[in-house]
Amino acid sequence: MNVAKRHFLTHCSLLGTFLIGCGGLSALPALAQSGDKPPKYTVLVVGDSLSAEYGLARGTGWVALLQARLAEEKKPAQIINASISGDTTSGGRSRLPALLLRYQPSHVILELGGNDALRGLDLRMTEANLAAMTQAALQADAQVTVVGMQVPPNYGTAYARDFSQLFERVAKQHKAALVPFFLKGVADVPDAVRLFQADRIDPNEQDQ
């Protein structure tokens, strides 16, 4: 296994640990016996290419690994991955009401905002969209985890700071769980470029 793959899989495992421990998934009861009827817990993931397995073999992204981790711990939850590569917070906001109605999730993970930054969109709009999505999920009786992102320094110190902080504000204002930086341990390590695909945005899982 190459270094990039190992780093990415390790990161996925750590993210899964965080979501289980801090994202409300630890509260899911394990099955006492194999014959028990599993309760209906549904985890809805609304994200972009980082969650949609863009450029990766099916079943190797962090969402699939989280599903495997929950199964390993005998936590009977179904994960619905409604992520779309290239999606923005505006796109997610427009899609979320129908997703909530269709799946009636017990938990919602919001991994959006990166493409807003790549397109230079107004961060006030990004924050408003994430806040609206969080509020909608809470009103649907779901526990919410907001997944934060960061942008490189070349975006400007002020923009990078404001972008990072908007996720914190949304989570704090709505009392949602927060993953401060989705790519911590991947994008912030020396020579991080080797851990990414050619677009230098999405982590690389392929052997070199």
Question: Residue ranges of each PLM-predicted region?
Answer:
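Alpha-helical cap/lid subdomain in secreted, periplasmic
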Residues: 65-75, 93-208
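Intrinsically disordered, low-complexity proline-rich regions
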Residues: 13, 39-40, 171
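Short, solvent-exposed loop/helix junctions and linker helices
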Residues: 2, 40, 60, 202-205
